[in-house]
Amino acid sequence: ASLIYEDRFGPNGHSSEDIETVPTSEIPKHDLLCGGFPCQDYSVATTLKNSKGLIGKKGVLWWSIHRILSEIKDKPTFLFLENVDRLLKSPSSQRGRDFAVMLQSLNDLGYAVEWRVINAADYGMPQRRRRVFFLGYKKDSKVYKQLKKSTPIDWLLKDGVIQNTFKAEQDSEVSEFVLDNDLVDISNNFNVGGKKSLFENTGMMIDGEVTTLKTFSVYKGKPTPLKSILEKGKVDEEFSIPKSELPQWKYLKGAKSEERVSADGYVYKYAEGSMVFPDDLDQPSRTIITSE
């Protein structure tokens, strides 16, 4: 990823240092903190049951963001954070607990937060990529004051920053609840035994009060199909599938429900759904790896 950033934007202003090792005294003053902490523990490439969230080795990198916001004197006015949408349901034993911990952490640090799950293809992009984006506003900011004057529903469906960029309409009843202000209690007790997360794909939190609801995207532009971005011309042979391998590819991409044997001799039932093969050029590209 670091090499790609350098190639696209040049080496100036780019750093590949581990943020966990950088003293906050060396981080310059900034108005906007952007972060996309690793998603291996939340990704749809693994099952929810195996997701470790904040407990997992990768998930704890969230606390690097928390450390910066806790230690620097002049906190950034705005936060722009992103993760896979599975974050709203993680971990499997306490649906939504990890996101609740993050929201309460940001509340403790003096921020209001709004979030939305956005699929890039729903707004004209050439890839089906679903991610949750959450924006934070410091309590002394102009946006926070505007949010405070508005009602949660007006903000989420009319006045909010996300809504004014990515239009959406209400698709469910509104749910409201208050987060416990003790992070340890949230970590231990939030939604224990709950089969469904309390967080929908759209919502906001201000002063610990959460408002959340389902929305659906509203986009009046044209979709961008995969064929419109593919390079024209001869395709190198290394990217071609020999005809002799097509049956194997069709099997791998097809639906399955079969018995398999593990390395230690355990017989188990393996099942998975099918994937389109070959990819439909008239549709936006599927998400690489996770195949949404």
Describe the function of each predicted region.
Residues 38-42, 85-86, 121-124, 139-141, ...:
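Short, solvent-exposed loop/turn segments at secondary-structure junctions
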Residues 1-75, 83-99, 107:
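Core alpha/beta nucleotide-donor-binding catalytic domains of modification enzymes
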Residues 203-292:
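C-terminal target-recognition/interaction regions appended to catalytic cores
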Residues 100-117, 138-142:
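A SAM-dependent methyltransferase catalytic signature shared across enzymes that methylate proteins
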Residues 78:
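Short glycine-centered segments of the SAM/dcSAM-binding site in methyltransferase folds
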Residues 125-203:
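Flexible, glycine-/basic-rich loop-and-beta segments that form/coincide
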Residues 102, 114, 128-132, 284:
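Residues that flank catalytic or metal-binding motifs in active/ligand-binding sites
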Residues 14-17, 85, 111-122:
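Conserved S-adenosyl-L-methionine
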